[in-house]
């Protein structure tokens, strides 16, 4: 009899415009992993979606690499594993696919290495590997989270924000935009006054969300100075999507993570017509309504 670890890991959207590398929200698109020990001589992978089939099956596989990294940190050996994978999180689109895989890898190492990590420790590990908590924190906990990683003390602090009472639309282009390429578009330095201005906007936006003032929050989400002005030109459809969203009185249109996916906070009474208008007019993308995920990663052990 072998135990199967089943994981359902949500997607995430980072930044919400002005919360660069610090704010993220979990979404109901999922990476599904089913993991069990194998009698083979190496790790095995079974992919059930076309996008995952492009992933490596050797030791360069990201999940394998992270799981072994975690196992080594806690001085445990992992058995050879068979991982079945199905994902509806598009790769390299700004929806946290790498963060979902990272969290999955930590859970795999934790279970098959019998490490007994708490969720807090999972967060610390994930952020240390990722470098910032904006995707991994909501992936682990669900909901909308603001966080800070101190790279000196290696400590991550997070705070939960009320789930926004808005409809969320994602407009997903057909092309990829690697995070590394998107980061190269950013300036190396900001002036002190620029940093103060952007920080003030971000702080006020969070307060507006906490007060459920979505008019103000949306207005501020679109005034980022940290990354949006330098990345929007990488997404050919951004201006058209923002124009259509504005015509439907949306609260905000921003880049999801590093892009190229575009995130819209919509009024609930307008979201259906808005998503249909986007699909009619922006034919190089697929737009869809996505629920905010409130539970984070789900783990289940199946006994066979």
Curated annotation (Swiss-Prot):
Pathway assigned in UniProt: Amino-acid biosynthesis; L-threonine biosynthesis; L-threonine from L-aspartate: step 4/5
User: What keywords does the record list, in alphabetical order?
Assistant: Amino-acid biosynthesis, ATP-binding, Cytoplasm, Kinase, Nucleotide-binding, Threonine biosynthesis, Transferase
Matching PROSITE patterns: GHMP_KINASES_ATP
Q: Name one GO cellular component term.
A: cytoplasm
Q: What class of enzyme is it?
A: transferase
Q: Quote the catalytic activity from the record.
A: L-homoserine + ATP = O-phospho-L-homoserine + ADP + H(+)
Under the heading InterPro entries, the entry gives: GHMP_kinase_C_dom, GHMP_kinase_C_sf, GHMP_kinase_N_dom, GHMP_knse_ATP-bd_CS, Homoserine_kinase, Ribosomal_Su5_D2-typ_SF, Ribsml_uS5_D2-typ_fold_subgr
- UniProt keyword annotation of Phosphoprotein present: no
Cite a single GO MF annotation.
Answer: homoserine kinase activity
Q: List its EC numbers.
A: 2.7.1.39
Q: Which GO terms describe its biological process?
A: threonine biosynthetic process
Location within or outside the cell: Cytoplasm
Q: Give the function comment from the record.
A: Catalyzes the ATP-dependent phosphorylation of L-homoserine to L-homoserine phosphate.
Protein family per UniProt: Belongs to the GHMP kinase family. Homoserine kinase subfamily.
Q: What is this protein called?
A: Homoserine kinase
Q: Which species does this protein come from?
A: Staphylococcus aureus (strain bovine RF122 / ET3-1)
Q: Which gene encodes it?
A: thrB
